[in-house]
Amino acid sequence: MEGGSSKSYPVILAAGDRGRARPVLGVNKGLLDLQGAPVFTHVMASLEQSPWVDSIYLVGPQERLMEALERPNLPFKGTKPVTLLAQWENLYLNIWNTFQKVMEDQRSKNPALLPEDLTVLIVPCDIPLMVPEEVDEFVQGCDMERFDYVVGISSEQTLSRYYPQKHRRGIRLMCFHVREGSFRQNNLHMVRPMRLGNRDYIQKIYDHRLQREWGSILRLLWEIFMAEEATLSTATWYLMLHMAAILHGIPKVPLYRLPAYCLPKARLERSVSRLFRTRFSTVETSFGGAALDIDTPEHYGVIKENFEAWIRMQREMIPSGR
């Protein structure tokens, strides 16, 4: 019985705006308005509809989040218990300290629960297009008998449904390219934090997450080189990932496939396992909404324009009777 009730998990919903968090239009991304409700409440609505979610631990600017939750007619109906925590200095501390609270609560229910066995689902506050079925698909795909950290990914083919078209604006996101295809991480993380050896790397990767500039790329490469667990192979796959991304931008000539072919996804997962000193894997989801975070004012505008249509499109993908 991991993480609380049978086959369900506590969720850490990250809504902080300190450290390297980037506001959009000067506002915490989770507190932006979307169809008359804060963005983070759309995320909470999808979480509460998933049978795999036991409870929600919301961490961020406590007073503003509390005020937002007291507004009428929210998409979140309060069917799952919510614990609201004040934020700390950065993303890592928000997650780690919230996990300590989760552990305290779970052990009060189950004193025999070992800290290293507690599994949590970590989700950001700015993915309002995530549908409950994508949460279900991700959690069901996580083999937590074999792995301790699983990240969700979506294929470029899946994400192409959200690309710009003649009749509407869209969002085109950068993908990483491996032998099996092109993918993007989709913001869903299933993890046993106590079995993640290099937990502090989460903050380092987050700090350099917008790796479109060579400065950010090289800074993270230096961090990888300095890691005790890093090898030349680890640095090589990192550079090859970026080489493939750069070559992917050359139109009509698929040169990116050359470095991508040298990177089987399993090899990448093994390297990440070494770097984090854990058992790491990925799970592909087929909806795509969780990958579309609100990262810029343009993304915010596009999601507002297409919200109903893109939610409806994902609903139409759900098999009848599910």
Where are these regions (language model features)?
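Short aromatic-hydrophobic micro-motifs that form the base-stacking/packing surface
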Residues: 119-123
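Conserved core of the sugar-phosphate nucleotidyltransferase
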Residues: 130-274, 284-288
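The conserved acidic donor/metal-binding loop of glycosyltransferases
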Residues: 124-128
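N-terminal nucleotide-binding beta1-loop-alpha1 segment
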Residues: 1-25
